[in-house]
């Protein structure tokens, strides 16, 4: 069993993720070994919200070069979390 805090790494802020905020869907980068049930429990525990559904995808490995050396960026799992209508997550602090 993994610690719930370690499963959700950080929210992804992209153009598509910003559009999904209007539909009450939030995008997070998660641990590769996390299951949908683990992610649901972690989001509900960390943010005190009710999760309706979770869509995940394991993004492919990307090869990178630096001169003659070839390396790779690590794979990661992206999770799109849909919340109930009356629940929100405050990702951006308002000062």
UniProtKB/Swiss-Prot annotation:
Residue spans crossing the bilayer: none
Domain of life according to the entry: Eukaryota
Keywords of the record: Chloroplast, Plastid, Ribonucleoprotein, Ribosomal protein, RNA-binding, rRNA-binding
GO cellular component: chloroplast; ribonucleoprotein complex; ribosome
Disulfide bonds: none
GO biological process: translation
Gene3D superfamilies from the UniProt entry: 3.30.70.330
Oligomer status and interactors: Part of the 50S ribosomal subunit.
Keyword flag Lyase: no
InterPro entries: Nucleotide-bd_a/b_plait_sf, Ribosomal_uL23-like, Ribosomal_uL23/eL15/eS24_sf, Ribosomal_uL23_CS
Function: Binds to 23S rRNA.
Recorded family membership: Belongs to the universal ribosomal protein uL23 family.
Record keyword Chloroplast present: yes
Compartments it resides in: Plastid, Chloroplast
GO molecular function: rRNA binding; structural constituent of ribosome
Protein name: Large ribosomal subunit protein uL23c
């Amino acid at each position: 069993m993994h610690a719930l805090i370690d499963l959700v790494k950080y929210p992804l802020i992209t153009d598509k993720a910003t559009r999904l905020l209007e539909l009450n869907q939030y995008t997070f980068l998660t641990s590769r070994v996390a299951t949908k049930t683990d992610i649901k429990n972690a989001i509900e525990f960390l943010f005190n919200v009710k999760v309706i559904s979770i869509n995940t995808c394991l993004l492919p490995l990307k090869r990178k070069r630096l001169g003659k050396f070839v390396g790779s960026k690590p794979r990661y799992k992206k999770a799109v979390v849909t919340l109930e209508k009356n629940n929100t997550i405050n990702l951006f602090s308002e000062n």
